[in-house]
Design a protein with these regions (language model features):
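Residues at the starts of beta-strands that form the adenosine-phosphate
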Residues: 3, 29-33, 93, 118, ...
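A short acidic, glycine-rich active-site loop
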Residues: 59-77
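Short, surface-exposed alpha-helical segments at coil->helix boundaries
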Residues: 73-81, 134-137
């Protein structure tokens, strides 16, 4: 049975990733371990140019670091649970975990605990993806002797 490490968060549920799951299952017995890095929910507006420039913000209304982290974990958990349910509906053997916010750390942990035949990294498109901006695919290829497939969601 081939074991696949799938690393994704915001792209879980996307058609491109679903197509890869179906392809791997069609090749033969497959087991998927899905890691959803708990990307911090740091969606705060930092450029107020449209409003005439920066303006003072009352710090008491900003989320705390713990709130940002907790929201990121909750989003990753919801995405992961939805994807695992989808995979089970397809008849796949699948499980997973919410991982470290740093995707490389999450991958290292998974590989330290289990053996995989392939890593499937699912990202947002270039220009939006922080993972691509961090050169994550090349870093993974350099560090691990495991085939890597990069799945990029459309714009």
């Amino acid at each position: 049975m081939y074991r696949y490490l799938v690393v994704a968060n915001q792209t879980l549920g996307g058609q491109e990733l679903q197509d890869v799951f179906r392809d791997r299952m069609a090749r033969g017995p497959a087991q998927f371990w899905v890691v959803a890095p708990a990307t911090p929910a740091t969606q705060l507006i930092t450029d107020f140019g449209a409003l005439g420039g920066a303006f003072p913000v009352d710090p008491s209304i900003l989320p705390t670091a713990a709130e940002i982290r907790d929201e990121g974990v909750a989003v990753a958990r919801a995405n992961l649970d939805t994807e695992l349910a989808r995979l089970h509906e397809l008849g796949a053997v699948a499980d997973g975990a919410v991982g470290d916010p740093n995707p490389m750390t999450a991958i290292e942990k998974a590989i330290g605990e289990q053996q995989f035949d392939e890593i499937i990294l699912s990202t947002l498109p270039t220009g939006i993806s922080r993972w691509l901006a961090l050169d994550l695919p090349h870093r993974i290829r350099r560090k691990f002797d495991i085939p890597l497939t990069v799945v990029t969601a459309p714009r």
